[in-house]
């Protein structure tokens, strides 16, 4: 049976490698969130148990958002079978106040590309446009869908067998 600390650390490492590495989300700016905001995308951080405040972040993490936090909620040990069952809650955090021109992909006909199109991002003045909107929730659900896909496709996560028959809440 793996130590609890190792189980938590291994899950956080798995999240960083298998989930966070596949998505980039907006890094918040505490002082600007309008047209003056220079949009920056980062891979989410993965944290054990709680999301630290800005003054407690590890050196390689620019902000507590975007992130996923793995919280151990419940556990049990069957001493006879030498079996442990752990329940984790994954808390996702992201931030998106609106759409910046530089994050939009535009199609361009390209007969050599799969499907006949390639895509590019706007640069220059058109990349600096900004539209405040209520679509930031889409980032949250895209992040959640990525987590669900990776969990559903895994038989083992960080050395632990997933009890798929229990489902995901």
Tell where the protein language model's regions lie, with residue ranges.
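Intrinsically disordered, low-complexity acidic Ser/Thr-rich regulatory segments
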Residues: 56-64, 126-136
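Acidic-leaning, charged glycine-interspersed low-complexity segments
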Residues: 132-169
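Small/polar-rich, solvent-exposed N-terminal microdomains that initiate assembly or binding
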Residues: 1-82
